UniProtKB/Swiss-Prot annotation:
The gene is mtnr1ba. The lineage of its organism: Eukaryota, Metazoa, Chordata, Craniata, Vertebrata. This is Melatonin receptor type 1B-A. Its main location: membrane. Induction: By cocaine, which increases the levels of day-time expression. Disulfide bonds join 105-182.
Amino acid sequence: MPENVSLIRNRTEVGQGRAWGSGAGARPAWVVMVLAGVLIFTSVVDVLGNVLVIISVLRNRKLRNAGNAFVVSLAFADLLVVCYPYPLVLHAMLHAGWLPGEMECKVSGFLMGASVIGSIFNITAIAINRYCFICQANTYEKIYGRAGTLVLLTLVWVLTAIAILPNLSLGSLTYDPRVYSCTFSQTTSAGYTIAVVTVHFLLPIAVVTFCYLRIWVLVLRVRRRVTTDVRPRLRPSELRHFLTMFVVFVLFAVCWAPLNLIGLAVAVDPPRVGPLVPDWLFVMSYF
């Protein structure tokens, strides 16, 4: 009997979700198919790319270093969202609503948040690692030994867990029919939303920007032969690795900046600003 009551409650919540705004039920079939296609393509690329990265590092002894440890951690963070949340999002798209229960919704939202915040924290850790390797060569080995790297990796995921756990107590992980997924609600708590955007996006972006700017300055100085102190640290392979991670950072920042800026704007005045955000803009920033 309790299971039947729970099922009825879940179905009712789905029905209410469809009626909210211009929810999933009001969306043309071709739009749903396009979004589903984008999600499937993204999932396949995520799995293939990140699994190849992990296998390459594990199989090649030369790639097993402190810098690549954070790259593997980043790949793992990306895979979190593919293993559970994305299949449920695809299921919600094809069924015009969320059919699984509330627990599945919470788990999906938790893993999606862990993936996003874990990614930004790992990208930050990679930038700091590259900065220390290239600009602070004398202290690099002291910080990034085997034990130090393990401690820093653990710290990245502990901070990620600390960042996500408040969502469970605040009840801010809810189903959003605009994006067919259980995600962080930007209107649950204005103060918490501002804190999330500031601490988990703007601050890491500032740290990464500082690190890469310092590296760029040093690279330009070396190329212009202003200094030769760090030339051994700027081998072509290391420069390519730096450029690759810099591109990853730029793409991540560009992709996630719109959603975070929308959240910041909504948090300032949820009742007034929230309804002004067009569904298409929110969906585009999310996907």
